[in-house]
Amino acid sequence: MNKVVEKWDEILQIVKTEHDLSDVSFNTWLKPLTVYEVVANVVTIIVPSEQVGLNYISKKYKLPLQVTISEVTGMQNCAINFILPED
């Protein structure tokens, strides 16, 4: 199993804590995210909402997720792609 998948819940909790997210924000935007695949240093994450949600998450949480994934897993130069379930 990949380290990102293995530690996904921990990664999300760290982002929540370090960025002082409310439970509502966390449960709305981050908790529903799931790791689709990890290839080399690219993490593909499924956003189970419409395009608006994908755009918002990409703008607001992409960098915090990249930094936290790198810190927790040791993955250098981590890149993130967000996709919708139908992609």
What do the predicted segments below correspond to?
Residues 1-87:
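Intrinsically disordered, low-complexity basic tails and flexible linkers associated
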